[in-house]
């Protein structure tokens, strides 16, 4: 190193240090002889015992060399690098490992035990011997890879050496001695991870099987996280333990921070870049952390003059120095201009110094605006000195810490400083000098290269420097001014240059603009610098980039992030964009950041760029203002070969991830059917030209995984080949003529008619279903299937899962003892295909699944367990249900139900699975047993209640009919009696599931039995009542109207209201000539006058019922009969023909409003169906009794022709008619 400095000084003649003699030896200061002794300082000698140059040098050298071999280096680079490592860590002479250990011991003033020291050093020596042997065997094999013997030796040594490291690492992490051993641990961990990388680089060539390579790779990933978190945790522990109260403790604290950043954290930041699957080509990494060399102040005062050391000269407190010197987290910037202000400290004309008392520093981020900071006193009478740093790397500073004595008061300041610079864009270099003048004072030289030496001594320091000056702060006291230089690693370039032939990592603190809500925060210790934190919903930051290609080239983009919730991210570079892409959460809310918290947001859609561009990152789904952390952005150049290799590695990783590590013939927990389809798409899109054999092998594995998925799925027809397909073997209950829905539901899907099955699209590889909305919540869109009891295992948890492309108001139920229910709203997108990519349609119209596409929320799992609310916006969903004991006779099973009951609702879903998850243990087992017992107790109570209600309902139904043939009504049976019996039938609870009333419940069979007889009764009653719509439930349908009349709702009944005497309502009715009929009318008269209901034939034979407001109700006989051969022709057509016949004889207002409504409208049963106000197609109307004031009158009528007319009118006031019946008498 000395030769390099000499070389530099010979080239730069103007850089010689001023010849400032030590006048103190010649001075005669009789007033205070001690002043002379206090000024005796050997210039140029820094004897601070805390600094160990060899320790720092080794750490810097190793980190610098590693930066050059990241990703997949050339074989020659690896051989050379390992030779370098062995020479650095196991050289001839004193053991560097012992120096690492002693250096940290001195900093923290804690020594490890002798046993720990001896054991660690002995084990390290053994590792060194083995590593040297491995390195030599690797070189031999790289020279002749076909040599079987060399390959065999290398294979054996590799396995043994990796195992040695695995066993040795705990010896460098002894409890209560973690901090002093930390630098040893970090260097050993680095070697272990580099060794594990060799399995991916060379393993297949020197004999490792694919399973062994995968195992070593997984160990590398695991150990990377373990070693990173360990080093960061114990670094922070050691640093916090050194936190003190005074300036001297701060000096030691800062030295620990600096030296262990160089020897530990810089290595840790590079660990993830050893992953050859993530970095399959040469990779450029950057360290943006900032470190601080020691303050430029006297530290080597002679014995007895300790007060002249800067930290004893009334220096500020620990916390004051930390606040003044250490910059808060910030964007990376570069100094452009330094203006130094000076004051004079004079004892005499022969003892004085003009020294640095304050400064103003102008800095700029990459492509950002200029910022200015001032420190110390800038209001002085001496002309300031201005130094220009624009586009210059200051790689070395040389500064004098001056000491002057005024009477008994020491003055600490810097009278002279030199800044050696180099322009990294060209060969220019030089130096800048600060000095105003000084003489007769003591000086101590501080050379930054003592604390931050170059990466190598083999080249001049202006080429091999490791750090550049980034900022200057100032420690200020009454008679103290001590500048502190901060430095960044030279790997953090000034231009954010993106390479066209290697992966480029750009830390996001190299941005030039952060939008509101975004800030820089301290890194967790393993990121190589500070990171970005944001809670914005929109644009996050902007940064300048320089692509070294002049023509457009495509790059893949990925962002390293940590998030406690799902995130939709977009990166824009110039006019090219990745489009929005969804990424899952990586950590829990309020969890501390660890290496496990970070993962890559990798965009499948690349960008095209060249030259100078501006890049931006934005988030589009953070309405809740959640916090996200970003570390860096990476650009991977895309070439045909790289793309094929990248796709192959991605597909291999995806296929391997389908199966468990212990059993490659068993699916891993959490692998879904949709996931398998997605992996099959990856494999199918592999290049036949580059990897045909691998593609075939992977395709066989994926097919096997799909078969395993099909075998475990308990759903019938999960691929939606049909809906509502009747099996050939469904049984029928002969007594009730009731098809066993339980049986048919166990053999496929059943649903409403508006559901459609669609072939696969760009989201689904297989069939999927579309569930539209509905206009009436009582008639929802539904899809269901039953998992039969025989398919289930006792005391087991099962999981329903699937993929939802998009949905709104989609309700999902799993029903056994009770219902597990979730409502999911999953937003979709108009297209998953970016506008900039090729057409997503194949030659035959099929989706081109190999075209680049983006997803809005991929792989976001929504697992709903034990009543938890399922997060919205999750395309993957899962819902669990627990099964207790199995009862094949009861056949309770599990109902799987999808339902939409809103007009706006909709859903597109597929890849549905119902699979066994795990046996129930502990609390879950106890919980399902309690639920089962509660359900059985409820069932027993229901059975007792059902027996009573059924008996009452059956008696009422039987009373409607003449006998048990149920084909003739009793003569006195009227519509009110039928509805009263129907109401009793509907008191039978749990005839159908409240969640979906087309699914039968435990009492469905007896309900359908009685309900069928009610329907028969209504049919028979309709057959003998020849008046159509006589209860006006269908408005004025089948009636002819003259004048103004209306059908209104009164007491929950439909009534005809005739408010004017000139109005008239009539109906022509066909009858059986010579037979007897009873005309029965229930009505109410308001006001004066009479209400009249007249029956007549076309010329004569007229009779009439009259209603008045002040008369008593009369009782009429109710004998009725049937006209079976005629009523078979009654219906809508007959109604229309009767009206037509009537129009031939009478004038009819054919424009009268007709508001049709179903004859038996569904209504709410608040007394028996509290959990569901909709009864689907059950034929029951809540028929209330006739209100007080209404009268029922009857007359007998014997028509002589086949047609009669019934007319309704009044003389004045208002006439309200509840019903009109014309009943055929029995013969």
From Swiss-Prot:
It comes from the Bacteria. InterPro entries: Cry1Ac-like_dom-VII (IPR048645), Cry_V (IPR041587), Galactose-bd-like_sf (IPR008979), Pest_crys (IPR038979), Pest_crys_Cry1Aa_dom-IV (IPR054544), Pest_crys_dom-III (IPR005638), Pest_crys_dom_I (IPR005639), Pest_crys_N_sf (IPR036716). It holds the Pfam family Endotoxin_C2. Keywords: Plasmid, Sporulation, Toxin, Virulence. GO terms for molecular function: signaling receptor binding; toxin activity. GO terms for biological process: sporulation resulting in formation of a cellular spore; symbiont-mediated killing of host cell. Toxic segment of the protein is located in the N-terminus. Promotes colloidosmotic lysis by binding to the midgut epithelial cells of many lepidopteran larvae. Belongs to the delta endotoxin family. This is Pesticidal crystal protein Cry1Be. The gene is cry1Be.
